[in-house]
């Protein structure tokens, strides 16, 4: 039996309102639990449209057929009008999710984090994280114990900024296996659970066709030599590709794969995890930098 952590990112108002309820129903039908990470502040995701001038981002949008994949309400959110507050508008849905699934913070403002966090000060990072955690805790009525940086935009600064919040774990980077981030000699931070597998939008195109994606990703899960962690998005697998996600759950079960919340991947003694660090890097299929796992001894 192969255990795979299932992470569900919720980036937008529509993803929360439409995608999450469908995912909750789908997961319930198959007896699967996952980790949901919510954006709880303004939905300004449409402001990413200016990035179309960048060839890699434009190619990604064309390759994934973004207009039909996400919908124009997502692609234009927060452009000609102020972005609506996701948490306030969908508090009931978020509370229901937290009743049945591990629930953590994705971002206060997903667009702002993905666009600006790379040059924010530690204080600005801490203030933004605090705003998101405070809002999410007010909605679910209990402490937030985990987080996942929006767009995997994380580095050593983000690791340090999250330390005051005493979270059980963070999932801020791409990598191969769980690790303890080294803050300074002799001091380690909150355990990191990296995402190890590609997302739908990173690979769909000439190399992998939509109809063969489930077979392809299951093969990758079974071949993963580390601690497999897979990310889906409420805006994709919860809406237009919900039938394909349901098919994935069936195929994965038949292949001997069990999905679980990320928190279940943590060992009883986190001190046993290897040391590592998060550095800025790039991966195929994703425009811009993102946090990548690196051995602690690497320079």
Curated annotation (Swiss-Prot):
<keyword id="KW-0443">Lipid metabolism</keyword>
<keyword id="KW-0441">Lipid A biosynthesis</keyword>
<dbReference type="Pfam" id="PF01522">
    <property type="entry name" value="Polysacc_deac_1"/>
</dbReference>
<comment type="similarity">
    <text>Belongs to the polysaccharide deacetylase family. ArnD deformylase subfamily.</text>
</comment>
<dbReference type="InterPro" id="IPR002509">
    <property type="entry name" value="NODB_dom"/>
</dbReference>
<dbReference type="GO" id="GO:0036108">
    <property type="term" value="P:4-amino-4-deoxy-alpha-L-arabinopyranosyl undecaprenyl phosphate biosynthetic process"/>
</dbReference>
<dbReference type="InterPro" id="IPR050248">
    <property type="entry name" value="Polysacc_deacetylase_ArnD"/>
</dbReference>
<keyword id="KW-0448">Lipopolysaccharide biosynthesis</keyword>
<keyword id="KW-0046">Antibiotic resistance</keyword>
<dbReference type="InterPro" id="IPR023557">
    <property type="entry name" value="ArnD"/>
</dbReference>
<protein>
    <recommendedName>
        <fullName>Probable 4-deoxy-4-formamido-L-arabinose-phosphoundecaprenol deformylase ArnD</fullName>
        <ecNumber>3.5.1.n3</ecNumber>
    </recommendedName>
</protein>
<feature type="domain" description="NodB homology">
    <location>
        <begin position="2"/>
        <end position="260"/>
    </location>
</feature>
<dbReference type="GO" id="GO:0009103">
    <property type="term" value="P:lipopolysaccharide biosynthetic process"/>
</dbReference>
<dbReference type="InterPro" id="IPR011330">
    <property type="entry name" value="Glyco_hydro/deAcase_b/a-brl"/>
</dbReference>
<keyword id="KW-0444">Lipid biosynthesis</keyword>
<comment type="function">
    <text>Catalyzes the deformylation of 4-deoxy-4-formamido-L-arabinose-phosphoundecaprenol to 4-amino-4-deoxy-L-arabinose-phosphoundecaprenol. The modified arabinose is attached to lipid A and is required for resistance to polymyxin and cationic antimicrobial peptides.</text>
</comment>
<keyword id="KW-0378">Hydrolase</keyword>
<dbReference type="GO" id="GO:0046677">
    <property type="term" value="P:response to antibiotic"/>
</dbReference>
<comment type="pathway">
    <text>Glycolipid biosynthesis; 4-amino-4-deoxy-alpha-L-arabinose undecaprenyl phosphate biosynthesis; 4-amino-4-deoxy-alpha-L-arabinose undecaprenyl phosphate from UDP-4-deoxy-4-formamido-beta-L-arabinose and undecaprenyl phosphate: step 2/2.</text>
</comment>
<comment type="pathway">
    <text>Bacterial outer membrane biogenesis; lipopolysaccharide biosynthesis.</text>
</comment>
<dbReference type="GO" id="GO:0016020">
    <property type="term" value="C:membrane"/>
</dbReference>
<dbReference type="GO" id="GO:0009245">
    <property type="term" value="P:lipid A biosynthetic process"/>
</dbReference>
<dbReference type="GO" id="GO:0016811">
    <property type="term" value="F:hydrolase activity, acting on carbon-nitrogen (but not peptide) bonds, in linear amides"/>
</dbReference>
């Amino acid at each position: 039996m192969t255990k795979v952590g299932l992470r569900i990112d919720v980036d937008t108002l529509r993803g929360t309102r439409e995608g999450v309820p469908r995912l909750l129903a789908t997961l319930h039908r198959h007896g699967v639990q996952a980790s949901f990470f919510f954006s709880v502040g303004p939905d300004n995701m449409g402001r990413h449209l200016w990035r179309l001038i960048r060839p890699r981002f434009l190619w990604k949008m064309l390759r994934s057929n973004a207009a039909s994949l996400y919908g124009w309400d997502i692609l234009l959110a927060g452009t000609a009008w102020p972005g609506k507050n996701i948490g306030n508008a969908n508090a009931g849905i978020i509370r229901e999710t937290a009743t049945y699934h591990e629930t953590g913070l994705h971002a206060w403002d997903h667009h702002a984090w993905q666009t600006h966090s790379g040059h924010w000060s530690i204080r600005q990072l801490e203030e933004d994280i605090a705003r998101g955690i405070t809002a999410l805790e007010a909605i679910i009525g209990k402490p937030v114990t985990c987080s996942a940086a929006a767009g995997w935009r994380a580095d050593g600064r983000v690791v340090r900024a999250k330390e005051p919040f005493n979270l059980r774990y963070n999932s801020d980077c791409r990598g191969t296996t769980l690790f303890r981030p080294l803050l300074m000699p002799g001091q380690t931070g909150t355990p990191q659970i990296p995402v190890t597998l590609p997302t739908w939008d990173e690979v769909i195109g000439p190399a992998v066709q939509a109809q063969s994606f489930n077979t392809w990703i299951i093969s990758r899960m079974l071949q993963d030599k580390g601690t497999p962690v897979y990310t889906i998005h409420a805006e994709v697998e919860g809406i237009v590709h919900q039938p394909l996600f349901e098919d994935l759950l069936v195929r994965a079960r038949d292949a001997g794969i069990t999905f679980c919340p990320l928190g279940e991947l943590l060992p009883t003694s986190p001190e046993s995890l290897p040391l590592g660090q998060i550095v800025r890097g790039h991966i195929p299929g994703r425009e811009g930098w993102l946090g990548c796992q690196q051995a602690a001894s690497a320079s």
